Regions:
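Bacterial Sec-dependent N-terminal signal peptides
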Residues: 1-26
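Beta-propeller-forming repeat regions
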Residues: 23-388
Length: 388
């Protein structure tokens, strides 16, 4: 006799099947294998990689310490960072030889102190001297982009409720005195910041919570025009500008930094040059997508989206704060993003991204590795390549 499932069973079965499909590679891709290695248990939320001692090997810098490569066991103290509740006041790790002495320095800043600083690499073991770049107000996090195309990055902190300011290293300085010029491009902006060419004129624009700021032909002397295309709340830093569907128009990928959701906004331009945006969901089921990167981590020539949860971004106060912690990469399959899980589980088992992370080939095996900090510790996910 025919067998009929109750409707409730059908619903459960279909839901499980859908999740299974989303988590698997499509027919044109194979999953990557990652080996997780715990580096430290401190709860600094930012990390980057650089060759600190100029021995040709990449080291890891996070918070008050740097870890010597290639094994990252030996660590060196950099200096103190103030702590406020669960937070260390250290929300970026931008690598930049600020004073031109050949040693890679680090730029950071924090919410509580409201100060953008650069930490001077002594070139050897010992404390890194801290220099003030600007007192700019509460810093959510900071990013760097080469806005004028001169080969030197500018520094752009996200300071919600405060002016949006670009900090440019002043040229022709000696090592003893280093100053940054400040260029205000907006009187006030909110949570979220991105950079990329929206209108196809070859210049990078700034993306903020209320729209995008069009870069003029003289970015440090002419006004930036706001196009109020968006109305975002607690958007990610960065918001990524990339041509997702390869139609010749750049789109924007935006995470919800303190809520559920990861989306991409498809740019469309009609014959009258009117610009509209169509919102597409990438992952509506996870929360606190505070930071993200694009990188080719499977060596197929196409960029993947790498992101995950900023664990305890607002302590216990965000939607999804008590959900499992995850790190993922998403691959465009021609129609949508396919999700691959790198790490997922309860705190201590799953691992998130923190607020600033790095992707580099640490062990010279031609596969890019992922280095993530956070309130759930400092880890490296060594990329072992495609599963066979």
């Amino acid at each position: 006799m025919p067998f009929h499932l109750p409707k409730s069973c059908l619903i459960v079965f279909c839901n499980l099947l859908s999740f299974h499909i989303v988590a698997q590679p499509n027919e044109h891709q194979s999953a990557l294998i990652f080996e997780k290695r715990q580096i430290a248990s401190e709860s600094f939320e930012s990390v980057n990689v650089l060759d600190i001692d100029k021995d040709g090997v990449l080291d890891i810098f996070s918070g008050s310490f740097w870890y010597k490569g290639p094994d990252y066991i030996r660590r060196n103290y950099v200096g103190p960072i103030s702590r406020h509740g669960e937070y260390y006041d250290d929300f970026s790790t931008i690598v930049f030889d600020v004073n031109g002495d050949g040693n890679k320095d680090v730029i950071t800043g924090g919410w509580f102190g409201g100060v953008l600083v650069w930490k001077e690499n002594p070139g050897k073991e010992g404390n890194w001297k801290e220099h003030i770049v600007a007192r700019c107000g509460n810093i959510e996090t900071t990013r760097s982009w080469d806005i004028d195309g001169d080969g030197v990055v500018e520094i752009v902190p996200n300071t919600p409720g405060k002016p949006l300011v670009i900090y440019k290293l002043r040229k022709g300085q000696t090592n003893d005195v280093v100053k940054f010029d400040s260029i205000k491009v907006m009187d006030q902006h909110g949570h979220g910041l991105g950079y990329g060419d929206i209108n196809g004129d070859g210049r990078g624009d700034l993306i903020v919570d209320k729209g995008w700021l069009e870069c003029p032909d003289a970015p440090f002397s002419k006004p930036w025009v706001l196009h109020p295309d968006f109305d975002l709340v607690q958007a990610s830093v960065p918001m990524l500008v990339t041509d997702v569907n390869q139609d010749g128009l750049n789109d924007v990928i935006i995470g919800q930094g303190h809520n559920y959701g990861l989306n991409w906004y498809e740019q469309q331009v009609d014959k009258k040059k009117n610009r509209t945006w169509i919102k597409h969901s990438i992952d509506p089921y996870n929360a606190q997508f505070h930071t993200m990167m694009m990188s080719d981590i499977d060596n197929d020539g196409a960029l993947e989206l790498i992101t995950g949860k900023r664990y305890r971004a607002h302590d216990d106060n965000d939607p999804g704060a008590h959900d499992p912690v995850g790190l993922y990469y998403f691959k465009w399959n021609g129609e949508s993003f396919s999700k691959q899980i790198i790490s997922y589980g309860p705190p201590g088992e799953g691992k998130g991204t923190g607020i600033f992370f790095a992707i580099e080939d640490l062990n010279n095996d031609k596969w890019k590795d992922i280095v993530v900090a956070g309130k759930d510790g400092l880890c490296v996910f060594f990329n072992k390549g495609v599963a066979r």
